[in-house]
């Protein structure tokens, strides 16, 4: 946003990449599209000091390898995330257990250890997302109204980076599968083969689905491109329903749309996609 308004930017990130949680191949597309927006992108770097001077704000950096550097800026925006306020709202005075970090533990009905007190949203733990909180609130309201069967039992919760292009992912990521040794089948459909993406002039993205190598059930998916956040809900539904690559691939998607790339990614995994040349084995 600041770059769009004409500001020159340096971005500092202590970890080894932006958008932690998303697969690196998704982020790579975003980074390539936005490289021109940054004068510097300093990864594995932390800010160790800032001092107001006559020329501006002098900021000191230190890399994880011990290297040191400085920069002078007109403005500094520090994004430090959020911390739960469980210890600040007096919940413990009502008998509610509050964890050491300030989170409040709840059961599947969003009850705290005090049966008539419920907690939802960021204060009950990760992921700190509004759409998760809304579903938790529904459960809490239903239980408080007398529904003894209501539970928060979502298998997956989608995440979206509302950037340009958008990055969205849900369920198991490819990086997680590799780290955990889970064997998966991948179906990746590049938007360079999407008629709608080409017509939009935005074919830089792709849609990726991951399936269990044996059962062929979908485990996760990621999308990078315009309106990725609008599309990821279908992948979440497929995971919740236990769909496999045939279920998704045989579902007729409207053409030409970006959404049909989900069906085509499933076809790629199945080996039946006719919109791409055959994959070499």
Each model region followed by its residue ranges:
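Short, surface-exposed charged micro-motifs
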Residues: 49, 95, 109, 208-210
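Rossmann-like dinucleotide-binding cores of NAD(P)H-dependent redox enzymes
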Residues: 1-67, 127-134, 142-176
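Flexible, glycine-rich terminal cap/loop adjacent to redox cofactors
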Residues: 145-146, 162-281
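FAD-site-proximal beta/loop scaffold in flavoenzymes
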Residues: 69-146
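Hydrophobic alpha-helical segments, especially N-terminal targeting/anchoring helices
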Residues: 12, 62, 98, 106, ...
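Residue-level structural signal for beta-strand termini and adjacent loop
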Residues: 24, 53, 118, 223-224
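Short acidic-glycine loop/turn motifs at beta-strand connectors
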Residues: 54, 100, 213-215
């Amino acid at each position: 946003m600041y770059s769009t308004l004409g500001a020159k930017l340096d971005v500092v990130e202590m970890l080894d990449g932006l958008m932690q949680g998303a697969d690196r191949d998704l982020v790579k597309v975003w980074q390539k599209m936005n490289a021109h927006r940054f004068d510097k992108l300093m990864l594995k770097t932390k800010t160790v000091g800032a001092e107001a001077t006559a020329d501006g704000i002098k900021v000191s950096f230190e890399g994880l390898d011990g290297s040191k550097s400085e920069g002078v800026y007109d403005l500094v925006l520090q994004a430090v995330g959020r911390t739960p306020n469980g210890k600040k709202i007096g919940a413990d005075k009502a008998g509610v257990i509050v964890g050491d970090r300030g989170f409040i533990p709840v059961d599947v009905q969003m009850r705290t250890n005090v049966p008539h007190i419920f907690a939802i949203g960021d204060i009950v733990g990760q992921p700190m997302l509004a759409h998760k909180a809304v579903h938790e609130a529904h459960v809490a309201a239903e239980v408080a109204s007398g529904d003894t069967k209501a539970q928060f039992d979502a298998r997956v919760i989608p995440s979206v980076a509302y950037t340009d292009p958008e990055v969205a992912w849900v369920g198991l990521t490819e990086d997680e599968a590799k780290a955990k040794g889970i064997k998966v089948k991948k179906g990746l459909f590049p938007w360079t083969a999407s008629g709608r993406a080409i017509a939009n002039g935005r074919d830089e993205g792709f849609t990726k689905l991951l399936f269990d190598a044996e059962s062929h059930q979908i485990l996760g998916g990621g999308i990078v491109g315009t309106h990725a956040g609008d599309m990821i809900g279908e992948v979440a539904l497929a995971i919740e329903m236990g769909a496999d690559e045939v279920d998704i691939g045989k579902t007729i998607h409207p053409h030409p749309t970006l959404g049909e790339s989900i069906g085509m990614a499933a076809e790629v995994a199945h080996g039946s996609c006719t919109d791409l040349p055959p994959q070499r084995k």
